[in-house]
Amino acid sequence: MFIGIAYLGGDRQMDELPDHLVWDILSKLHTTDDRNSLSLSCKRFFSLDNEQRYSLRIGCGLVPASDALLSLCRRFPNLSKVEIIYSGWMSKLGKQVDDQGLLVLTTNCHSLTDLTLSFCTFITDVGIGHLSSCPELSSLKLNFAPRITGCGVLSLAVGCKKLRRLHLIRCLNVASVEWLEYFGKLETLEELCIKNCRAIGEGDLIKLRNSWRKLTSLQFEVDANYRYMKVYDQLDVERWPKQLVPCDSLVELSLGNCIIAPGRGLACVLRNCKNLEKLHLDMCTGVSDSDIIALVQKASHLRSISLRVPSDFTLPLLNNITLRLTDESLSAIAQHCSKLESFKISFSDGEFPSLFSFTLQGIITLIQKCPVRELSLDHVCVFNDMGMEALCSAQKLEILELVHCQEVSDEGLILVSQFPSLNVLKLSKCLGVTDDGMRPLVGSHKLELLVVEDCPQVSRRGVHGAATSVSFKQDLSWMY
């Protein structure tokens, strides 16, 4: 688009374009390369682009880091979102942005509201302290920042009064939790993500206190290796009193490797999320049917449920059947979740599945009663050709993903052509399907996308023409 303008009008005519037209042109360019090319076409475009550039993503190519960062801040005076990402960094690529670099950023980027620091291994608590001079900072994401401690996060909480979104991922030295207490008093956090921060456990979340009222999104994941070394220590969860957790605003809840203690702690959270729309439970120990039933009876707006269920072999210390999810949970979901669009089940170990968990009939009941658009089954050994036949009546189903579903054969796969609304099919590591099962799809124009990965009896030739777009990969190392 901008090339045509330059050719037809020349530099002089472009300089005479009304401001609103220039802004409109710039707003329609979404890639950095396009905007850079346009800004080089004339001085006016260069100047206006600098004024309108609100986001910046930088990383290994920033050398020397502090000087280059200063130059960028001066060139783009209205930056509000900055991402500094050093994924794949090596020492030969030059020094990373450090505490001095953050000082440069906070001193010269006065409109900063959203900052992401990923793999920034040179930044310490001192650098995080510089963020206190950013009064408008509302979002901070730290991904693998090993030199930052709880003291640094506390200084952030004290200095950045408008912080609404905080992500801490693999911040291994964030040990103290005074910052959680401080946020609990402020009652300002709306989105909190804590993943694989080894020193932070379920029991520490109680320190949020009244901040639970404001939270709309909580993602909390315990480091799996650290958890297993503690052998499912119940001390953390015992610190939670049996009380009502005020979490009416929570819309998204994601828990990984967590202990769900009956009647307290995160179990109270599950039972009081009446406005929840998205639930993800990944390898959470102790979740019971009563927890799910209590949740779905209140959360009538649930649209997405994802469950990764521990197997019997994975949890040798928990043999209480009452602490397992069964068809009672699926029946409750089917009865109360009239808006459910996405449902995913995954078992952690297909060779040692839970003997007391979901049955085929329970899964079929849910699919038949809920308007599910996306269904994903991973290591669900009970799902077979009868299940595929039941999907023929799933009027809303558009996306189906089967992973390690070894009981599905060509007989079931052939039925895909009869699914009323299906347009995306994904098959991975399924031993029972072959090229014969794909034949009815070839040339049928039924599917928009077909993804086949690591299915040993399906060939590239067999999937050719089976969908508008086909992705085929085969790596059979998983079988050996």
UniProtKB/Swiss-Prot annotation:
The keyword Repeat applies. Residues 11-58 form the F-box domain. Keywords: Leucine-rich repeat, Repeat. LRR repeats lie at residues 61-86, 94-119, 120-144, 145-170, 171-196, 197-222, 229-257, 258-283, 284-309, 322-347, 355-379, 380-404, 405-429, 430-454, 455-480. Pfam families: LRR_6 (PF13516). CDD domains: F-box_AtTIR1-like. The keyword Translocase does not apply. InterPro entries: F-box_dom, Leu-rich_rpt, Leu-rich_rpt_Cys-con_subtyp, LRR_dom_sf. SMART domains: LRR_CC (SM00367). This is F-box/LRR-repeat protein 14. It comes from Arabidopsis thaliana (Mouse-ear cress). The lineage of its organism: Eukaryota, Viridiplantae, Streptophyta, Embryophyta, Tracheophyta. The gene is FBL14.
